[in-house]
Amino acid sequence: MITLPARPESLTFAPQQSALIVVDMQNAYASQGGYLDLAGFDVSATRPVIVNINTAVAAARAAGMLIIWFQNGWDDQYVEAGGPGSPNYHKSNALKTMRQRPELQGKLLAKGGWDYQLVDELTPQEGDIVLPKPRYSGFFNTPLDSILRSRGIRHLVFTGIATNVCVESTLRDGFFLEYFGIVLEDATHQAGPAFAQQAALFNIETFFGWVSDVESFCHALSPATPLSLAKEKRYA
């Protein structure tokens, strides 16, 4: 068992009965020229997040935690995205950007394309699980719940992009399904202004889960392990 310092209080759990979830660390969300960048969102601060996720993944893997990687997107014909009868058709900024810029049609969040791929610095390894998801929440239309329940996993540690969209959506759905959700704040990044990150973390800490950081997570798993973290204070 480990005890992880977190807000509003510490949590105690077994690493082998928990999972580290890496949400949507794709070129779409973390790279210049990806969907978020093309849609007008600032992705300039994602490099430290990638470094910190790598650190968290290495610590989790060494401790025997299951690592689950999500990739958000759809088939190259966008059937999975939903047509005009779907709210996703109207609210997805990727779909809206492609309608506004026809030259991008088929390039954003399409399975098999560069935008859909995980960033080069983050590579799943044997024993990890990689799951596609068609909507913001990793629980919707995916086998995530059955994967976790069949392994007796109740504690989920979240990293990835975007904190205020897919990370928070997945953590919230997990809360409703009786999972304990913890987000590592310095291994996440928001889509939008800094207050979106602050608001998401407030919601999680106050209503739906717990907030910790990569250093605390790694020290809890292996107190003697030296860390290599990206130190960048981005939020007041």
Curated annotation (Swiss-Prot):
It catalyses: (Z)-3-ureidoacrylate + H2O + H(+) = (Z)-3-aminoacrylate + NH4(+) + CO2; (Z)-3-ureidoacrylate + H2O = (Z)-3-aminoacrylate + carbamate + H(+); (Z)-2-methylureidoacrylate + H2O + H(+) = (Z)-2-methylaminoacrylate + NH4(+) + CO2. It holds the Pfam family Isochorismatase. It is an enzyme of class 3 (hydrolase). GO terms for biological process: nitrogen utilization; uracil catabolic process. InterPro entries: Isochorismatase-like_dom, Isochorismatase-like_hydrls, Isochorismatase-like_sf, RutB. Keywords: Hydrolase. GO terms for molecular function: hydrolase activity, acting on carbon-nitrogen (but not peptide) bonds, in linear amides. The active site is at 24 (proton acceptor), 133, 166 (nucleophile). Belongs to the isochorismatase family. RutB subfamily. HAMAP family: RutB (MF_00830). Hydrolyzes ureidoacrylate to form aminoacrylate and carbamate. The carbamate hydrolyzes spontaneously, thereby releasing one of the nitrogen atoms of the pyrimidine ring as ammonia and one of its carbon atoms as CO2. PANTHER family: ISOCHORISMATASE-LIKE DOMAIN-CONTAINING PROTEIN, PEROXYUREIDOACRYLATE/UREIDOACRYLATE AMIDOHYDROLASE-RELATED. This is Ureidoacrylate amidohydrolase RutB. It comes from Klebsiella pneumoniae (strain 342).
